[in-house]
Amino acid sequence: MSAVGLPLWRQHAHALWQLSKPRVVALIVFCAVIGMFLASPGVPDAAVVVPATLGIALVAGAAAMVNCLVERGVDVRMRRTAWRATATGEVGARETLLVALAVGGMGLALLLACCNALTAWLTLGTFVGYAIVYTLLLKPNTPQNIVIGGASGAMPPVLGWTAVNGQIDAFALALFLIIYTWTPPHFWALALYRRDDYARAGLPMLPVTHGQRYTTLSIVLYGFLLTAVTLLPVALGEAGAIYLGAVLLLDGRLLFLAVRLHRQYADALARRLFAWSIWYLTWLFAALLLDHYYLIPLN
């Protein structure tokens, strides 16, 4: 959404809002909320769900702002990110940092006051893992950046889970592993059709360092691994026929696109796989939620 034509203060507020990567935060919050509902045999208490959702969203937005701040020099060299306010100079480094710290601090305070210390500490760890470890240390230095750094992005359902019951169970770890395994092929698909952008910016993404063929093969292999990991909720007895049917269809489609991409590469196919992977995760977690309340046993 363009902010052109708005008063200057609203344009500035819009620029700050965009630095928080609202679309990414929306998916993070969605997975966290699903984790909250899965952690409860009934409907979780709204007095926990509302502040937990807001707290996680605020910290996620703050982490995204720090990411944009740290990468402003890189963003200038990439067509995909050159418009960001930190790259154009519309929002200064000091202001970005202060707003991020204020927003993140409010989120953590909310989690500590209305949820529990475990969730607050895990959320802080996730912030540090993404904004500092991934952004500063991993992304500019290793093609395995997304494999190692993906742990931070896989935390939302665990944060939602602990917000409700204050502990980490096997099912919560299974949710973590699903997103952790999903993350590399999701981002590698993006990096494939944006490889020139990443090369121009000097970022060692897998398609830049190892080439297209190696990357598409890696996507296929991770696709098969993801298929196995998504069966964990069934193996743990936490999901039934609804989820199993959904996950077989979703994994089948993902593998079909991955294999096709490997056999006859085209940027358009990589784009399609990237877009599908977002819907894949959304529908998979929606199926988990539906199955949770309308469980159809497999035996």
Curated annotation (Swiss-Prot):
Catalyzed chemical reaction(s): heme b + (2E,6E)-farnesyl diphosphate + H2O = Fe(II)-heme o + diphosphate
Main location: membrane
Coiled-coil regions, chain positions: none
Source superkingdom: Bacteria
GO CC term, one of those recorded: plasma membrane
Membrane topology: Multi-pass membrane protein
NCBIfam families linked to this entry: cyoE_ctaB (TIGR01473), PRK04375.1-2 (NF003349)
Family label: Belongs to the UbiA prenyltransferase family. Protoheme IX farnesyltransferase subfamily.
Biological role stated in the UniProt entry: Converts heme B (protoheme IX) to heme O by substitution of the vinyl group on carbon 2 of heme B porphyrin ring with a hydroxyethyl farnesyl side group.
Protein name according to UniProt: Protoheme IX farnesyltransferase 1
Taxon lineage: Bacteria, Pseudomonadati, Pseudomonadota, Betaproteobacteria, Neisseriales
Gene that encodes the chain: ctaB1
